[in-house]
Regions:
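Signature of N-terminal electron-transfer/Fe-S-associated modules in redox systems
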Residues: 1-152
Length: 153
């Protein structure tokens, strides 16, 4: 099936602001958005910049805006989004190039909130016990993959 992919492109060396470029790709409905970006980079335009690493939703490096929603490109199938597919960098962070953003301010803020357990007692001879209620207080934060998708939406 033909997919119209619209990507917000920006190269600071030649562009004053971002502009949309369109690509028509043959895609399977079960391909991921990340697969489409690879097709563009490998076969249409090698200058396209985007982050990716594990391709399994673990690293969070491929967070971007797809059809107006923050998501991981490796976790979204073509059949789950409408055609044309519009892709842009996550908002609220400076764009380095195309879909790559500077994450420094995100990580600086993350460090300031000290997202780890702090205990001022010396370690004992045995493990520290944790109740289910204590664990529930921070359960959701243990699932964070540091992609910035939730904080930039």
């Amino acid at each position: 099936m033909d997919i119209n992919l619209k990507i917000l492109r920006y190269n600071p060396e030649i562009d004053r602001k971002g502009h949309w470029e369109e690509y028509v790709l043959d895609a399977d409905p079960d391909e991921r958005i990340l697969d489409l970006l690879h097709k563009v980079k490998w076969f249409d335009d090698g200058s396209l910049a985007f982050r990716r690493s594990c391709a399994h939703g673990v690293c969070g490096s491929d967070a971007m805006v797809v059809n107006g929603e923050n998501m991981l490109a490796c976790q979204v199938l073509v059949k789950e989004v409408s055609n044309p597919i519009k892709i842009e960098p996550i908002r609220g962070l400076p764009v380095i190039k195309d879909l790559v953003v500077n994450m420094d301010s995100f990580f600086d803020s993350y460090k300031k909130v000290m997202p780890y357990l702090i205990n001022e007692e010396e370690p004992g001879e045995r493990e520290r016990l944790q109740s289910p209620e204590d664990r529930d207080r921070f359960e959701d934060t243990t699932k964070c993959i540091l992609c910035a998708a939730c904080t930039t939406s």
